Amino acid sequence: MAQNGKKKIGLIGGGQIGGNLALLAVQKSLGDVVLYDIPAAEGLVKGKALDINQLAAVDGYDCRVKGTTDWKDVAGSDVIIITAGMPRKPGMSREDLLEINLKIMTDVAGNIKQHAPNAFVINVANPLDAMVFALHKIAGLPKHMVAGMAGVLDTSRFKCFVAEALGCSIRDVEALVLGGHGDDMVPLVRHSTVGGVPLTELIAKDKLDAIIKRTREGGAELVGLYKTGSAYFGPAASAIAMAESFLQDRKRVLPAAALLEGQYGINGYFFGVPVQIGAGGVEKIHTVELNDGEKAELEKSFQSVKKTVDSVKL
């Protein structure tokens, strides 16, 4: 908690996602923000902090952002969101980032262990499932105080494409995407509805298959369009949804990468499933009844995650 009694949010990585996280956090009055990056990026984080603070009078918020390169400023954070790492570029998979981002995560996790061991930590860095596994191991965080942001974003993309296909309000689309944050993620079509009507009754199978494919390739589509980086608005909003539920004890049920201990037949790996997030962190892990086809798809997704995680050398 900040010295002024407000909640304190530590953002590790001052790039596109980090900057948007800082803006969203103060606009929602979630707490004061510390935007951290390495010394080479000192001007970047201090500039973004100043820019956002000068916007306060326009939007009418009283929370503040501090740009820093000193981990001591992160100490006492209630929640930490990690975005530090190399972003994807055209032609790269999330797994291609493993070696370089693992080195970054090792440093970040060690500093969290030293300076903010009681924070609820949300990882956004890719490859998501492997990075959150490394974070948990290195920082020694309790299993309920660490999670990976993936499912909120993947589900949001799926809902977006469904709403576009039907020309309906996205608010009426209920859907869930499980599994790893990669090409084998599992949109649960059978459990998806629009205004209570099953999705399968509204969209033909071939069109649904195309939506599923586009959802799985959603990150790559944006990488191809941006050319020099990856998505940042969506990831930032998704991570803030998780942080907000923790900070305000909203107990929202959101798809996120959590440590499984037998659920869905998986043990000892972080995997995307519906979880309840409240003041206690990941308070519950919910299981969804799956048919044989869905189980097979989820197992395929898990094997992809397992292969990447098992290659992590700590």
From Swiss-Prot:
| Highest taxon of source | Bacteria
List the keywords (alphabetical): NAD, Oxidoreductase, Tricarboxylic acid cycle
Residues that hold substrate according to the record:
88, 94, 126, 157
Question: Which NCBIfam families would you find in this protein's record?
Answer: MalateDH_bact, PRK06223.1
- Record-listed NAD(+) binding positions: 13-18, 37, 101, 124-126
State its Enzyme Commission number(s): 1.1.1.37
Q: Which GO terms describe its molecular function?
A: L-lactate dehydrogenase activity; L-malate dehydrogenase (NAD+) activity
Known HAMAP family for this protein?
A: Malate_dehydrog_3
Say which species the protein is native to.
Answer: Myxococcus xanthus
Q: Does the keyword Nucleus apply?
A: no
Quickly give the catalysed reaction: (S)-malate + NAD(+) = oxaloacetate + NADH + H(+)
BP GO annotations = lactate metabolic process; tricarboxylic acid cycle
What are the top taxonomic ranks of the organism?
A: Bacteria, Pseudomonadati, Myxococcota, Myxococcia, Myxococcales
| Coiled coil residues, start to end | none
Q: What is this protein called?
A: Malate dehydrogenase
Q: Which Pfam families does this UniProt record tie to the protein?
A: Ldh_1_C (PF02866), Ldh_1_N (PF00056)
Q: Which residues form the active site?
A: 181
- Name the encoding gene, please: mdh
Homology family = Belongs to the LDH/MDH superfamily. MDH type 3 family.
Known function: Catalyzes the reversible oxidation of malate to oxaloacetate.
